[in-house]
Amino acid sequence: MSRPPPTGKMPGAPEAAAGDGAGAGRQRKLEALIRDPRSPINVESLLDGLNSLVLDLDFPALRKNKNIDNFLNRYEKIVKKIRGLQMKAEDYDVVKVIGRGAFGEVQLVRHKASQKVYAMKLLSKFEMIKRSDSAFFWEERDIMAFANSPWVVQLFCAFQDDRYLYMVMEYMPGGDLVNLMSNYDVPEKWAKFYTAEVVLALDAIHSMGLIHRDVKPDNMLLDKHGHLKLADFGTCMKMDETGMVHCDTAVGTPDYISPEVLKSQGGDGYYGRECDWWSVGVFLFEMLVGDTPFYADSLVGTYSKIMDHKNSLCFPEDTEISKHAKNLICAFLTDREVRLGRNGVEEIKSASFFKNDQWNWDNIRETAAPVVPELSSDIDSSNFDDIEDDKGDVETFPIPKAFVGNQLPFIGFTYFRENLLLSDSPPCRENDAIQTRKSEESQEIQKKLYALEEHLSSEVQAKEELEQKCKSINTRLEKTAKELEEEITFRKNVESTLRQLEREKALLQHKNAEYQRKADHEADKKRNLENDVNSLKDQLEDLKKRNQSSQISTEKVNQLQKQLDEANALLRTESDTAARLRKTQAESSKQIQQLESNNRDLQDKNCLLETAKLKLEKEFINLQSALESERRDRTHGSEIINDLQGRISGLEEDLKTGKTLLAKVELEKRQLQEKLTDLEKEKSNMEIDMTYQLKVIQQSLEQEEAEHKTTKARLADKNKIYESIEEAKSEAMKEMEKKLLEERSLKQKVENLLLEAEKRCSILDCDLKQSQQKLNELLKQKDVLNEDVRNLTLKIEQETQKRCLMQNDLKMQTQQVNTLKMSEKQIKQENNHLMEMKMNLEKQNAELRKERQDADGQMKELQDQLEAEQYFSTLYKTQVRELKEENEEKTKLCKELQQKKQDLQDERDSLAAQLEITLTKADSEQLARSIAEEQYSDLEKEKIMKELEIKEMMARHKQELTEKDATIASLEETNRTLTSDVANLANEKEELNNKLKDTQEQLSKLKDEEISAAAIKAQFEKQLLTERTLKTQAVNKLAEIMNRKEPVKRGSDTDVRRKEKENRKLHMELKSEREKLTQQMIKYQKELNEMQAQIAEESQIRIELQMTLDSKDSDIEQLRSQLQALHIGMDSSSIGSGPGDAEPDDGFPESRLEGWLSLPVRNNTKKFGWVKKYVIVSSKKILFYDSEQDKEQSNPYMVLDIDKLFHVRPVTQTDVYRADAKEIPRIFQILYANEGESKKEPEFPVEPVGEKSNYICHKGHEFIPTLYHFPTNCEACMKPLWHMFKPPPALECSRCHIKCHKDHMDKKEEIIAPCKVYYDISSAKNLLLLANSTEEQQKWVSRLVKKIPKKPPAPDPFARSSPRTSMKIQQNQSIRRPSRQLAPNKPS
């Protein structure tokens, strides 16, 4: 039966319903967008947008715009409320600062509510906008938020305020790998583990379609179990469809940057994920060696080494690195076309370096790490460095005069992993009371759950800690067992070496005794010579005495004359000085008088100013009293306003309560209406059911009555049976009547309910009318109050205008007071300045007197020193002669040794001739053997023919296999198309619900086809397996044929055996001859080594003597210069020169400069720092001493020739970017010639000089392309040459270190000056020096620049070492970091 339409609906109701359905669908889509955390318009983004708009518009200048002011009035309060409800920095307690960078810092924090520990990263909005790059943090936030990888540090939430962005991340208490490498000597086993984890972490990032571009140990953090996670994704970039990246700037850390990324600067950068694998190679090298492979103190040095990596990559000899590790490093540090990992991670995973028994690529994260951090608590930060508090003022955005939009770039940054906003399902249409109860119950349950979860997590943590301790104890036990075994083996080795050493000791003692005899013999000779010298000296003295007796009288006369002259000269000088002092005294007295007069004038002015000041102060007091009265009036007015505002707020609250009551009434009304409609529906349903049942009963009754009548007519005889039937019918009728009664009672109940609902509706209508009346009354009251408020605001505006006028007057008066104060200060300053002038003049007078006395004393001391130095110089000359004679004797010995060597070589040649004869015999034997081999080759030909036949069979077999493979491929393609069709049909199913039956039939058909295809595929796979087994059988058959030996004729076998015997005999003879030869060679080699050692010792002694001579020469030069200065002073004093004529240059004469400077230790300032040396610059040499004692003993550390100096200059940040920023203004660089240091033991390993393919030659320069991220200027056009993120392409000369734009070279501009340094790299050196202050650095540079020869020194082809860079031989120390065997629980 068709149901009648509802009475209250319009004719077009179905169309409206359809429209509502479409609208609901769009609303759901919109809701999905708002709920989706990855959507740009999610709830957090919308709230951020509103918040940032209010922050950017809430300024006085912008509020003048009426629209902006209205917007702020509307949303300002609600935005403040949102800020109060949202997460903020105050929700966390800061434990410690664990990191600081250019944009902010990382803090270790504890959440106040949950008591959980996190790492919170703060990024300054001002710094990011100031440096014109605010996009890098988006990639970092998105990766950490949506990665869901165990290899990436997780982001729990991100929020912001007006100053900072906050990222709350998981805390990694193990610190970074830089900390681990600084505390431990990393063995290869550990390096294998950490490299494998880095590879897996990078693979996870690459699988997201990103390239990291800044892989380094600083960005590798360790969790509490010691496993690795990657961090700092600010440099990440999205790959295109081909897996490549387009970038015009070189991004990354200089030591870890790849060549292709370096080449991208200023050009079309196009590279792939292989740039990350380069960084992995650098990281592995650093772990095993202790330094990066392309380390240099300057940026240009590192970049040039990276570009020339084929020549510059070398492994140090003092560190043991396995062949597999070297191969892997070389495979990573190659050109990108051949680099390992270019074709996928599986390439790297299959490397032999990673093979081990402890872990594999699938379970590495479940295995125990090499170092598990020992933590005292959940806030243990011992693996992080202590960072000083930043006491500097935090910079903020200035107040704008127009709209700037500083907050707009950060809209959408807010994120929560567990987003509670809009997380619940839409609210059910039930009573509010039930919902509140349910929510309260759910909150209580959640609290209990949370407490249980916390308890569980603590228990789990405790369990994990115990398991870790057990694991660590097991690993320690294993380590100790291994160490024990190693110690046993080491002990055995030591014992064997001890025996060898004892034998060598006995030999050395024997040699020592022989050398002692020789030394005694030499000593006797020396004593005899000394006796002869003494006798000669006695004779000389006798002769001198005779001569002196005749000359004494003349000398006395001369001495008296000299004394008279000296006394006269002294008298003259004293009279001159007395005259000078009188003049200066008169001048000073005049100056004092002038100053006194000036002082009086100033005092008078001061008195006048004080009177003016008093007047102004009185006026100021009067104004202040007026101001206070105004303030009182204002406060009274503000109190009235506050009262009115309170009344308004009360009325507004009443309004709100009225609105809420209205809303509740409307809600109840709706609910009742809904109930009414439901009841009506039920009633109509019930009526329909009842009518239907009645009709059915009536029909059954009519049928039964008809049957009854027929039965009465037919069967009158069987009354008894009929009576029983009637009884049954009557019972059925009774049951039916009961049912009818029940239905009627139900109907009455429904009607009663309807009446009650109608009564309630009428009551609610009455209530509604009453509330509307109340609302109207309240609105009228509100209008009256608004008029009062307007009147009061007008009054307030008038008062503010009056106040502004008063304030302007006050400002004028305060300005006048300030000007008077300023003039008073100036007068006081002038007075102080004049007083200081007076004091200085008095001091100068006293100093002049002291200088005169000191000069007299120095004259006497220098005379004594001169006499002593003359005596020493004669002694040194005699010593030099003796040394020269000894040197000549040693050269003779060397010649004799060379002759012996030639004799040995002649003997060796004769032995070689004998060897050739034996070899000819062997050749004749080989001829006979070749005949036998020819016969053997005939047999092999037959064998090859058979092999060819087998190959043809194999080729046919392969063809058949390829055909079958093609059919399988075609089937697989059909299978793919079928699966794609299934996916398409599934999508259509969702869109077209009406055609569901048709699509299901098609799907079932497709599934049948798919099953049949799978069956066909299975058949073909079986065929493939059978083909493979046949193939393996064929290969095995081939191997049998190949390995089968062919029968050889018996007649030729005996000849071969005979010849083999003869061959063996010859081999034995050859062996014996070779052994004899090697023994002789060893013997002669030992003698040669001993000779070379002696020569080296002698040359070292000669160098040291030469260095002492140089230092003595410089001392003599100093004394001569001092003498000359004294003579000049004497002459000038006799002539009567003024006191201000001769000006000393910093306390040193023009030719000499000395002081303390620092040199870099092992050319690595980052690791080993600087060492202090006392440096003296004479007219010819630069002498370096370890201490002043060495200087007194004439024992220099290093000597350089000034003639060979090329260039001296102060360094920039790019030259020594590893040095501390405070040290850079104190460092300068010396470039000098170095024509042969081969005979000297090198203190540092010499860096190999690579090809100059990457240099750009221009005007004598050797330019290297670079980028500057630090402040630097172009030395050609003086424009900025740097940028923090996108620097312009630049060039730097590797010789003179001039810096310029690359555009000058490209445009062929003539701005660039020629190179100041012309030298061959193989015969040149540079030296960095650190002065005590910037003033000293400037002094050293200016003085050394003057000493550089105008023409560059020509390299001497015959010179052995000019200049000498003679350094004392120091013990070879390892470059590795100091080892650490203790657990990693250390103070950072």
Swiss-Prot record:
- Phosphoserine-modified residues are 1137, 1362, 1374
Query: Per its UniProt entry, what is the enzyme's top EC class, as one word?
Result: transferase
**Basic and acidic residues composition-biased segments:** 513-530
**Segments forming domain PH:** 1150-1349
Please summarize the record's notes on activators and inhibitors of this protein.
Answer: Activated by RHOA binding.
Does the UniProt entry include the keyword Protease? no
Q: Which residues form the Protein kinase domain?
A: 92-354
Q: How is it modified after translation?
A: Autophosphorylated. Phosphorylation at Tyr-722 reduces its binding to RHOA and is crucial for focal adhesion dynamics. Dephosphorylation by PTPN11 stimulates its RHOA binding activity.
Q: Which of this chain's residues are annotated to bind ATP?
A: 98-106, 121
Enumerate the spans annotated as AGC-kinase C-terminal domain: 357-425
Provide the residue span(s) of the region labelled Interaction with PPP1R12A: 363-784
Q: What is its EC number?
A: 2.7.11.1
One of this protein's GO BP terms?
A: response to transforming growth factor beta
Instruction: Give compartment(s).
Output: Cytoplasm; Cell membrane; Nucleus; Cytoplasm, Cytoskeleton, Microtubule organizing center, Centrosome
The annotated site for Cleavage falls at 1131-1132
Zinc finger spans (Phorbol-ester/DAG-type) are 1260-1315
Catalyzed reactions per annotation: L-seryl-[protein] + ATP = O-phospho-L-seryl-[protein] + ADP + H(+); L-threonyl-[protein] + ATP = O-phospho-L-threonyl-[protein] + ADP + H(+)
Which chain positions lie within coiled-coil regions? 439-1024, 1052-1131
A GO MF term? Rho-dependent protein serine/threonine kinase activity
Implicated disorder: May play a role in hypertension. ROCK-inhibitors lower the blood pressure in spontaneous hypertensive, renal hypertensive and deoxycorticosterone acetate-induced hypertensive rats, but not in normal rats.
Name of the protein in question: Rho-associated protein kinase 2
User: Which source organism does the UniProt entry give?
Assistant: Rattus norvegicus
